[in-house]
From Swiss-Prot:
Residues 128-357 form the Radical SAM core domain. SUPFAM superfamilies: Radical SAM enzymes. Residues 2-118 form the MTTase N-terminal domain. This is Ribosomal protein uS12 methylthiotransferase RimO. It comes from Chlorobium limicola (strain DSM 245 / NBRC 103803 / 6330). It catalyses: L-aspartate(89)-[ribosomal protein uS12]-hydrogen + (sulfur carrier)-SH + AH2 + 2 S-adenosyl-L-methionine = 3-methylsulfanyl-L-aspartate(89)-[ribosomal protein uS12]-hydrogen + (sulfur carrier)-H + 5'-deoxyadenosine + L-methionine + A + S-adenosyl-L-homocysteine + 2 H(+). GO terms for biological process: tRNA modification. The keyword Transferase applies.
């Protein structure tokens, strides 16, 4: 039996991988500690998607090596995306590490730390999120060939998890107290196509909706061949959030072709119009990339105009990262870093104005909020239109109400900022 400190870096997909590992290891008697200094093994689940993530993973690994050198821990293992890309290089540069494991080597990781992999525990997880919400990873890998992305190299081909397995996993999460279920994958749009020849996403959402989760949220949809019946389900099912996260990346036809996105500007605009016509209450989140190779000032202005006209409810923007394992690495990274950052800032300044205007529409209204955190007489939570960690936060005064994390409360919104709603609790449930 060992005391293990697990550091899980990167995206929610990595979080689920770490949660599965913890459940397997705990079944073998392993104990997970809150702090590295209380452990004899450090295990780091790394991210290798973009340069910033790689640098964070390297920094945390070096910090763990120092603890081993100082004899504060006995062993250090590194797993996940970074070893999937750079196992040999990492092993050469960091001989102090006791083992490197890729993204599909869970049994090997468990064996290294003295635990046993058990097939019957495949659906079990120990949550790293607060106990009232969880992520359900419905597929692994990606078949898209977006030129800027190294995920197919890291995670492999797209493999949908069988519906019955997902329903078993979801049932266990519901029994444990999860009230909000967030469906994730690299691409949820094509869920089930490798199993049935067509998307099974809507069928899965309907079956999960019948399981009495209070909220079901869809994240990371791909715009090409998105199953539109899901939008109808959002409108018709009270516990399916009127919310869709659909990264679009750009609107310039030339850049979309170079990115190999499979959709042009006309198709993108028509898709958004169709989604909003079928469900006027839906809130759309998207992600853009600024500074893609060859992006001209005119193409960036086209992106700005598109965002201004479309008025997304939530939007993130990232500077293009020139990744050596992506197809776009053969292109010249010719937009200088300063210009990339300037373009990100300009786009986010525009979105801030849009977000402020949209948030003002909530002022004076009563809404339902899922409570994430309580500090003294203040509540921090989210509406159905806000995903964990990335979207708006509701900041509420509790008044005389006994509000606790995981509860739903009714709130009256009295003020707003671009990324927060402020108000007071007026009821529970």
């Amino acid at each position: 039996m060992h005391n293990i400190f697990l550091l899980s870096l990167g995206c929610s997909k990595n979080t689920v991988d770490s949660e599965r590992l913890m459940a397997q290891a705990a079944a073998s008697g392993m104990i997970f500690t809150e702090f590295a200094d209380d452990a004899d093994i450090i295990l780091i689940n790394t991210c290798g998607f973009i340069q910033d993530a790689k640098e964070e993973s390297i920094a945390e690994t070096l910090a763990a090596i120092r603890k081993k050198q100082d004899e504060k821990v006995r062993k250090v293992y590194v797993m996940g995306c970074l070893p999937e890309l750079y196992r040999k290089e990492l092993a050469d540069e960091m001989p102090e590490i006791d083992g490197f494991f890729g993204t599909r080597e869970l049994p090997d990781v468990l064996r290294a730390i003295g635990a046993e992999y058990r097939e019957e525990l495949l659906d079990r997880r120990i949550l790293l999120t607060p106990p009232h919400y969880a992520f359900l990873k419905i597929a692994e890998g990606c078949n898209r060939q977006c030129s800027f992305c190294s995920i197919p190299k890291i995670r492999g081909r797209y493999v949908s998890q069988p519906p019955e397995q997902l329903l078993r996993e979801a049932a266990l999460l519901r029994q444990s107290g999860v009230r909000e279920l967030n469906l994730i994958a690299q691409d949820i749009s094509v869920y089930g196509c490798d199993l049935d020849g067509s998307s099974l996403l809507n069928d899965l959402v309907l079956r999960l909706s019948d399981m009495e989760f209070e909220r079901i949220r869809l994240l990371y949809a791909y715009p090409l061949n998105f199953p539109m019946e899901v939008i109808d389900t959002m409108r018709e099912r009270e516990n399916v959030c009127n919310y869709l996260d659909m990264p679009l990346q750009h609107i310039s036809d030339r850049i979309l072709r170079s990115m190999n996105r499979g959709i042009d500007s006309t198709g993108t605009v028509r898709l958004i119009e169709s989604i909003r016509q079928r469900n006027p209450d839906i809130r759309l989140r998207t992600t853009m990339i600024a500074g893609y190779p060859g992006e001209t000032g005119e193409e960036f202005e086209e992106l700005l105009q598109f965002v201004a006209e479309t008025r997304f409810d939530r939007l993130g923007c990232f500077p293009y990262s020139h990744e050596e394992h992506s197809p776009a690495y053969r292109l010249e990274d010719d937009v200088i870093p300063e210009k990339k950052q300037d373009r990100v800032a300009e786009l986010m300044e525009l979105q801030e104005t849009i977000s402020q205007e949209k948030n003002r529409e909530f002022e004076g209204n009563e809404i339902v909020v899922l409570v994430d955190q309580v500090e003294e007489n203040m509540v921090f939570g989210r509406t159905e239109y806000d995903a964990p960690e990335v979207d708006n936060e509701c900041i509420l005064e509790t008044g005389n109400f006994d509000v606790r994390p995981g509860m739903f409360c009714r709130a009256r919104i009295t003020d707003s900022t671009p990324y927060d709603l402020e108000g007071e609790v007026i009821g529970i449930g």
